[in-house]
């Protein structure tokens, strides 16, 4: 879908809300995949629904002068790492890795994102952020290495 929109576009972010421990969307969850087109200066989002259906959205780029209201960091097109890693683990592997560092009974993943939040261990690089319904959030590197809690 992304390459049909713009062959030069690059994926910049993956974000899941209300995800099962197996990595699949719950009945009220969804996965979002965002791409950036330098040529068009626009974002392209694919929202994958639990039933397998999807929605496609095109959005303008944020104002280059925009800044995060908490960190005061300039907002770029989207995503932490500007170069997507050549290889990266999928959400199922990232969730399993994070679960191995979590105590207590877990029921779901409230949020799972790749290249959306920055890890202090690997600044400027893509990492998974996994947040369960109980306990802390966890950073997992693109290579599957556990990076710590957040």
Predicted regions and their residues:
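Long, terminal "pre-/pro-" and other extracytoplasmic accessory regions
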Residues: 1-150
